[in-house]
């Protein structure tokens, strides 16, 4: 089958439709080698919506294959947008690359349009990148606030995007989900959501070997993102 000639200003029809504008996925190295040798966050990450904003909480542990604790102070939630944050779940390298790519595209959109991208559009972009890119074994949570309200999305490794009032991803999700199912209600304040998120992460660290060593809490409102780390759970309550 013949290939169309490359014409000036014409987009390459063979290009990956899910690629970011600023780079090609072909230029990015996927995590290689034995999966057990890849640094993974293990992880329990939680996102909760309230009328006042979004609360995200994560533990701090990274491990090698879930058997050796390689780092005890990993920040697993990063700001990627003026009023949105994303968690790191899965391989550390893949998650960090994913965050850098998504943040760059969000910044480019804001520069060109003069306004931030909507959170639903940001979630769609994140799903497209997860589906089309070399980001190895990631399953992050995106939480943000825009004119339509507070939003929490889970992004699966195949690019699936699901919005909910609250969600959990990572190796400790079964334990943390139980705490949220028992305590969550629609009228949570931001302070109550913070307390619940921290308690759910703590519950997961009691049983999940991939989670532990403290907690990061991010509060997301229309005014911005605030991220604070605590070496012990008592300090976060």
From Swiss-Prot:
Localization: Cytoplasm
Reactions that this protein is recorded to catalyse: Cleavage of peptide bonds with very broad specificity
GO molecular-function term, one example from the UniProt record: threonine-type endopeptidase activity
A single GO BP: proteasomal protein catabolic process
Regulation: The formation of the proteasomal ATPase PAN-20S proteasome complex, via the docking of the C-termini of PAN into the intersubunit pockets in the alpha-rings, triggers opening of the gate for substrate entry. Interconversion between the open-gate and close-gate conformations leads to a dynamic regulation of the 20S proteasome proteolysis activity.
GO cellular component: cytoplasm; proteasome core complex, beta-subunit complex
Top-level EC class as recorded in UniProt: hydrolase
Keyword set, alphabetical order: Autocatalytic cleavage, Cytoplasm, Hydrolase, Protease, Proteasome, Threonine protease, Zymogen
UniProt keyword Isomerase present: no
InterPro entries associated with the record: Ntn_hydrolases_N (IPR029055), Pept_T1A_Psome_bsu_arc (IPR019983), Pept_T1A_subB (IPR000243), Proteasome_sua/b (IPR001353), Proteasome_suB-type (IPR023333)
UniProt propeptide residues: 1-42
Annotated catalytic residues: 43 (nucleophile)
EC number(s) stated in the UniProt entry for this protein: 3.4.25.1
Function, in words: Component of the proteasome core, a large protease complex with broad specificity involved in protein degradation.
Family: Belongs to the peptidase T1B family.
Assembly: The 20S proteasome core is composed of 14 alpha and 14 beta subunits that assemble into four stacked heptameric rings, resulting in a barrel-shaped structure. The two inner rings, each composed of seven catalytic beta subunits, are sandwiched by two outer rings, each composed of seven alpha subunits. The catalytic chamber with the active sites is on the inside of the barrel. Has a gated structure, the ends of the cylinder being occluded by the N-termini of the alpha-subunits. Is capped at one or both ends by the proteasome regulatory ATPase, PAN.
Designated name of the protein: Proteasome subunit beta
